């Protein structure tokens, strides 16, 4: 299908209707060359008077170059008009031209402002592009900001979501995007303020207060304050110093802006390595003195004052003469900054007492505004840090399989959070060992410090000097051994720091922040450290708290990854072990060939269709041939195309996977299967069940006690065995028997269901699971009421799936308990085997678990066996066989045998009672004879 041709006019119309799309595209895709072309086109042939650049974050300064336009005090020019009216917005009122003084860059004292060159405009544009918050007034932006959140915010989020891959990281980033924006108000023009200063000082002062009260951005607020102070006291330049480090007890005065006047952008006056700021120690120099003592300093000639430092003048080439310095206090009276005005205009005249009074009135408002801006900045910083921590959690959940990848993500996040030059992660070789030894180290260098940042991440396997320093880092070893963080502000002044190794490495370390990495068990698994903040300052308490919180999540992520690696190795070991066990747990080829070639006796010869079949009549090999005959007699080999060799191998392997316990062994499994075969063929239940269901119950009977350990489900729960932990406490052994059966079927050459269709296979596996789980007596008690009610009312309909389900469950239980339906000698012998196995479990409960076993498991109460057998028959067996006889009368011989065996147990019980009444001595001959049962 051919793509439709786009019309440029339609695209332009669309962008006009959706300016936010164009803005978003420009900010993401725009290049410097495009900005240069735009500036050249809009400035050529028009002169500088057509430009009205808005300095980012500052008051809107009208810098038109209307030649011949004097200032307010300079007289009227050719274009002056006595009828012109000032406009508070700094623009044109409807039909009224601007006053010449406002259109010019004049300040009211006759001096002209500096013109904004194209280079400066480009720098200003680049700075504004890097700043996320719009600090200049834009009518379109303001109108969009006033739209309801549902239209503006959702549109932006949808646009962002549609332009990014739908990953969890991008979705989370969009959801966590701040919904708080700085208020945007149109500032009044500087020349309008000059007019008010001449004609209405009260309104002039209110305008200055209003402009700073609406600004919550500390950068633009500081710039405004300096411009307005210059304007109030007619200073040539002003500087603002804010107090930092008060919380840590190391106060310093740091210039927010230095040497600014109302018309000059920020001058480069760097005295530090990485920033355009001046740091003044507390109490040093005039600025430090004012900050420490809170006094106003007004000096007519700065060079005559010994506190004055002329280094800045030498650096900038500017001559300081008069100076007015005053503290800025917050609402609590604490000094939060110092404002400095330099060289009163004209020609550096001394500042007057009126200047001091004006500043004293204005600076309290500045203090309140600065406090509000600092509070807002702190809240935004905490928001960004919280957002970063949430993104860290997302990163850790996304990657928990590869240690190198997760450490790389951790270090990238750490550099983003703390803005440092280098980040390192060191992992301990043995977390249990008292000797600290790092086995792995990872490092990441910031792009600012490395031209090849993409290749800076590596695992330190090379013998480089820096890698050696990482592994043998004494500070990291101290943190790993003590579990306490270390924050070194000046590495070369700390005795724990190896300055010689630092010099050899070629990387100059100034400050170090190192914290321990803990796992979920509160064990130290390594350390994380960051080096050298990009701004040259040491890491502060806020950095340390953030890094410690960050490392908590990282520790969990690293620990999970290490655990995953351990689990992966364990899984590999288990796979190898299972492969070895499966080799030894499967039958040999010779055994398979033997039974494959053997003649299988007929059903009549084996007597396996007899309900009263002798459970001990066949040896272990004869039971295999009898099982083969059952499969063939039921037509399952032909119906389901079961490979005969596979069937022989499967039966032999099933036999081999029964343990040599007293009762729940291969013979018991075969006897349960034989009784199921007899009931299917003798009672005609083949007509009730489907062929798939018949196959499921026959296989289920043979597999229903696979790998039985001679203990019941209650013992697994009491001992908190591995089986109980794996399968839970509900039908623990039955789930294990089924899973073991599945494992055998999945072994090579053992899948007797290989030729079934996909649906038949799925149905069969579900039926097989139901059949094996049905042998759990807990499930029998849950379902027998439903079965008994169906039988009592005669409402059963074998065409209904649910009726057949409960019927199959009852058949499985009836076959599992089938020994009680056999002749007395067989039934008593089985009871002795069951009791002996129970007694062994009771002995283990007494010796291993320190518990007193119940009567049926207590060897010391074995004389109570007849009574326990009567309770067993009456509560569990008799009701079941009575219900089955009602379903099919051909099972009446089974019920008769149960009744006959009950009479035998009743006789033994009565004899025991008589003997007990005559002689309470438990060593009597009768009681001793009963012990053999």
Curated annotation (Swiss-Prot):
- Please give the chief subcellular localization of this protein: cytoplasm
Q: Give the SUPFAM superfamilies listed for this entry.
A: GAF domain-like (SSF55781), HD-domain/PDEase-like (SSF109604)
Keyword presence, Repeat: yes
Where a divalent metal cation 2 binds, per the record, is at 705
Residue ranges of the PDEase domain?
588-912
Present the record's domain note. The tandem GAF domains bind cGMP, and regulate enzyme activity. The binding of cGMP stimulates enzyme activity.
Name the InterPro entries for this protein: GAF (IPR003018), GAF-like_dom_sf (IPR029016), HD/PDEase_dom (IPR003607), PDEase (IPR023088), PDEase_catalytic_dom (IPR002073), PDEase_catalytic_dom_sf (IPR036971), PDEase_CS (IPR023174)
Q: What protein name applies here? A: Dual 3',5'-cyclic-AMP and -GMP phosphodiesterase 11A
Q: Which PROSITE patterns match?
A: PDEASE_I_1 (PS00126), PDEASE_I_2 (PS51845)
GO terms under biological process: signal transduction
- What keywords appear on the UniProt entry? Allosteric enzyme, cAMP, cGMP, Cytoplasm, Hydrolase, Metal-binding, Phosphoprotein, Repeat
- The gene name on file is Pde11a
Activity modulation: Inhibited by 3-isobutyl-1-methylxanthine (IBMX), zaprinast and dipyridamole. cGMP acts as an allosteric activator.
Query: What binding details are noted for the cofactor?
Result: Binds 2 divalent metal cations per subunit. Site 1 may preferentially bind zinc ions, while site 2 has a preference for magnesium and/or manganese ions.
Subcellular location field: Cytoplasm, Cytosol
Task performed by this protein: Plays a role in signal transduction by regulating the intracellular concentration of cyclic nucleotides cAMP and cGMP. Catalyzes the hydrolysis of both cAMP and cGMP to 5'-AMP and 5'-GMP, respectively.
Reactions catalysed according to its record: 3',5'-cyclic GMP + H2O = GMP + H(+); 3',5'-cyclic AMP + H2O = AMP + H(+)
Active-site residue numbers? 664 (proton donor)
User: Which organism's genome codes for this protein?
Assistant: Mus musculus
Which sites bind a divalent metal cation 1? Answer: 668, 704-705, 816
Annotated region described as Disordered, given as residue ranges? 42-121, 913-933
Q: In this UniProt entry, which cysteines form S-S bonds?
A: none
Where do the GAF domain residues begin and end? 217-370, 402-558
Q: Which domain of life is it from?
A: Eukaryota
| Positions annotated to bind 3',5'-cyclic GMP | 424
Q: What is its EC number?
A: 3.1.4.35, 3.1.4.53
What does the entry state regarding organ or tissue expression?
A: Expressed in testis and developing spermatoza.
Lineage, top ranks:
Eukaryota, Metazoa, Chordata, Craniata, Vertebrata
This protein's GO CC annotations: cytosol
